């Protein structure tokens, strides 16, 4: 399934970022292989101070799903998630399925992989790729390998380096 849109997801509120979404989008737009593909990142508002972590995660997924619906994104989409937001890839994928928007793949950058308990029989519904810089938790990268996902080791977390891998995956 070919990709029409690359969606660079912001970090979960309150968690460290694996990449700067704006810089990564810029790097992807500069790569000639992404010509003809729409590339974007959406903003997620800060949570209320009294929101518990479960509510923060639910609002993050909901805001992204609404943002994708209202921005006129064409599927199939390649979802890029980093850090703690990687654990939310199942929920974000299901939100796209509910919107009847196909997902061409998931790219987890130095990310937390979804727990085995959160995986349902119909997820992943598209190929999952793990991009591991030296900053990646080796246990998370190993979990990706054990699940049969492709792991792409990169020498650094520079947006151009990560963007090069993502651009190649978007055109595969």
For each feature predicted by the language model, list its residue ranges.
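Alpha/beta-hydrolase active-site loop
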Residues: 42, 48-77
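Short, surface-exposed "cap/lid" segments of acyl-processing enzymes
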Residues: 1-48
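Structural motif
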Residues: 9-17, 42-45, 80-85, 108-112, ...
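Short coil/turn segments at beta-strand junctions that form active-site/ligand-binding loops
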Residues: 3-4, 74-76, 101, 126
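Conserved hydrolase catalytic core segment
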Residues: 77-78, 83-107, 112-114
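C-terminal alpha-helix
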Residues: 164-172
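Hydrophobic anchor at the start of a short beta-strand
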Residues: 36-39, 77, 96, 128, ...
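The feature captures the conserved acid-bearing segment of alpha/beta-hydrolase catalytic domains
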Residues: 110-163
